[in-house]
Amino acid sequence: MKIQSISCDLFYIPLPEVLTDSTHGVMEHFALVTVRIKDNQGLEGLGYTYTVGKTGGAATLAMLEHDIERLLLGEDPNDIDRIFDKLWWALHYVGRGGIASFAISAVDIALWDLKAKRENQPLWK
């Protein structure tokens, strides 16, 4: 089994009311980044991450499309821990938190979702 394709999208989700706090300031929407990982058997897993406001979403999307996709293609989607380690080591020089962590977490969720679908189990199991 191999990862055949990765597709990503960026959505700006408006909040029903403006939120504010001392760390993030005014928040009118969230930037939601989705990752779809398809294996060579046609199954697809969906993962996501988000940032607050207009910063970070486009950068996370760019990292997924330009850096992470090439690292994932051809990998065994069942080997989730090894893929996590591979991504962490490949990206840790550009940041152990923030955008790199957001992107890796979206991939991780998509891989677990794909595994759950393959095993006909709910994701929480």
Regions found by a protein language model. Give the residues of each.
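Structured beta-strand/loop patches that form or line metal/cofactor-binding pockets in enzymes
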Residues: M1-G53
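Short, intrinsically disordered, charge-balanced linker/junction segments flanking boundaries
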Residues: Q121-K125
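Metal- or metallocofactor-binding catalytic centers and their adjacent structured scaffolds
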Residues: K38-R118
